Amino acid sequence: MARYTGPVCRLCRREKMKLFLKGAKCDTMKCPIERRPYPPGIHGRGRIRESEYMLQLREKQKARRIYGLLEKQFRNLYAQAAGQTGITGENLLRMLEQRLDNVVFRGGFASTRNQSRQWVRHGHVTVNGKRVTIPSFQVRKGDVVQLSPKARNMIVVRHNLDTLDRIVPQWLDAVPAEAQVTVRELPLREQIDVPVREQLIVELYSK
């Protein structure tokens, strides 16, 4: 499967904000955006006229990069969100939050979504006691997500549980000692703390 393999800090600089794609490094002064808070490339420092389309595109790219999706995956998810009742933009963000790799990340067991996605792919995550290896799996209310016994003994997992000071969203119940997260309810828009203006994404895809 295709995936981005370039420097992720470059993506943060392109969006002119921290997307927290490198874990602990993003909280330090070593983060490249602290030293170079402008887009990468030879014309990065130049002033660019921000058109309506550019603003819409940047919001879409920002959301896509935060959750680590390719364009086709993101567009398919948008199509599903548009087919549901309710507000399309909120539906999209809710479905992004309900991804299994995101729930593992939100629970504080992984330092980045890339790391949580790798654990799902490698079979280290169970949902209601059954192993699930699909990162895009949509969790539902009442689902219990847990790391396997083998994963719980991994040094990197224990390190994350001991050092990550992440606030677990209200729609999740986390039990760090058991590396377990329970989905209390589906997330509401006010419970999703991503810096994305979803209405601009809807406007972009509605053209």
Role assignments for model-derived ranges:
Residues 123-127, 131-133:
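Glycine- and Gly-Pro-enriched alpha-helical subdomains that act as flexible
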Residues 119-120, 139:
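Short, well-ordered loop/turn sites that connect or cap secondary structure elements
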Residues 106, 121-122:
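Short, intrinsically disordered, mixed-charge
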Residues 1-107, 134-207:
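Ferredoxin-like alpha/beta domains used as RNA- or RNAP-binding modules
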